[in-house]
């Protein structure tokens, strides 16, 4: 049991290209890239909103202590 060699990966890659064609694979790659970009954007938006809320809560707490 050697595992997966480079030759085996090339054969599998060639079979995938033959089955789906280059246009379909290019389209699939673009869709996958868009999905990853959207996921990263959503994660950044969520963390920005969380940090903004935390800083607002901290400022609100400081205002209460001043009174």
From Swiss-Prot:
Residues 54-67 have a biased composition (Basic and acidic residues). GO terms for cellular component: TAT protein transport complex. One of its GO terms (biological process) is protein transport by the Tat complex. One of its GO terms (molecular function) is protein transmembrane transporter activity. Residues 43-67 are annotated as: Disordered. Keywords: Cell inner membrane, Cell membrane, Membrane, Protein transport, Translocation, Transmembrane, Transmembrane helix, Transport. It is found in: Cell inner membrane. Part of the twin-arginine translocation (Tat) system that transports large folded proteins containing a characteristic twin-arginine motif in their signal peptide across membranes. TatE shares overlapping functions with TatA. HAMAP family: TatA_E, TatE. It comes from the Bacteria. Gene3D superfamilies: 1.20.5.3310. It is a single-pass membrane protein. The chain crosses the membrane at residues 1-21. This is Probable Sec-independent protein translocase protein TatE. The gene is tatE. Belongs to the TatA/E family. TatE subfamily.
């Amino acid at each position: 049991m050697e595992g997966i060699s480079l030759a085996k990966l090339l054969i599998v890659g060639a079979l995938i290209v033959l089955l789906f064609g280059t246009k379909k694979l290019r389209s699939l790659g673009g869709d996958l890239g868009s999905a990853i970009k959207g996921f990263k954007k959503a994660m950044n938006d969520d963390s920005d909103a969380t940090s903004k809320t935390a800083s607002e809560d901290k400022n609100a707490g400081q205002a209460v202590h001043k009174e």
